[in-house]
Amino acid sequence: MQIHTTVASLRAARARAGRVALVPTMGNLHDGHIALMRQAAGRADCVIASIFVNRLQFGPNEDFDKYPRTLQADIERLEAAGVAHLFAPDESEMYPQPQRYHVDPAPAQVSILDGEFRPGHFRGVATVVLKLLNIVQPDVALFGKKDYQQLMVLSNMVREFALPIEVLPGDTVRADDGLALSSRNGYLSAAERAEAPRLYALLCRIRDAVRAGDHDFLKLETEAMAQLEAHGWAPDYIAIRRQADLQPPVHADDPLVVLAAARLGRTRLIDNLEI
């Protein structure tokens, strides 16, 4: 695997590649990331992974400084997965001067759900991803469904800017007990890790209830929030939304997704499940 720390080096390698798939990450890789790499390998001649902890998407009281940075272990995992190139720039390479131009996603997409609780987050995500797409110029870009709202925002960005890039979603990879794999799971204490699968269990319960014909969505959401609170969680939201735009359902036959975000101790976990 070739490791590139500069835009010039990465672009030179890209020019020699055929059909390219890009998998952007912030590092601290787990099996969910590796599943995306393998999915990418099936859709392109060359897989390029990026690792960059993007300051722009972190709020002032979030975990930018303590976000796990495990570059050597990540390199070993990527090599084992057969990734051809790693783009691992430092902050001065990605932002040689303060970023003055940004991507502002449509307010209807980012004032809800995670955007309500993390103002500015999706602006930072969209800005760095557009920059990565311009640097790499991939044919395909892959993003995990665990970050469902992010996937929607980035898919819409690529479409509305008419970028010649196919956006592919990757299914959420879970531990045996159902917990969605996340780089932030490492923040959990042993007791919190034992409790954490409750979030997925509640999403499954909501999915099954809706499939069985229960359309009292507010009741389902409220009961699940109460269940989390009763077990020591601090939920931000549990919401049943349309898959297409993450707005509240209008018709009973709308394809739906249930999304959740909640704090367990000091760790904020997110998850979702299509219905």
Curated annotation (Swiss-Prot):
EC number: 6.3.2.1
Top-rank taxon, per record: Bacteria
Record Gene3D superfamilies: HUPs, Pantoate-beta-alanine ligase, C-terminal domain
Catalytic activity: (R)-pantoate + beta-alanine + ATP = (R)-pantothenate + AMP + diphosphate + H(+)
Keywords linked to the UniProt accession: ATP-binding, Cytoplasm, Ligase, Nucleotide-binding, Pantothenate biosynthesis
GO molecular function: ATP binding; pantoate-beta-alanine ligase activity
Binding residue positions for (R)-pantoate: Q57, Q150
Binding residues for beta-alanine: Q57
Pathway recorded for this protein: Cofactor biosynthesis; (R)-pantothenate biosynthesis; (R)-pantothenate from (R)-pantoate and beta-alanine: step 1/1
Keyword Nucleotide-binding set for record: yes
SUPFAM superfamilies, alphabetized: Nucleotidylyl transferase (SSF52374)
Active site: H33 (proton donor)
GO cellular component term of the entry, any: cytosol
Transcription regulation in keyword set: no
Function: Catalyzes the condensation of pantoate with beta-alanine in an ATP-dependent reaction via a pantoyl-adenylate intermediate.
Subunit structure: Homodimer.
Similarity annotation: Belongs to the pantothenate synthetase family.
UniProt-recorded name of the protein: Pantothenate synthetase
Native source species: Azoarcus sp. (strain BH72)
Native organism taxonomy: Bacteria, Pseudomonadati, Pseudomonadota, Betaproteobacteria, Rhodocyclales
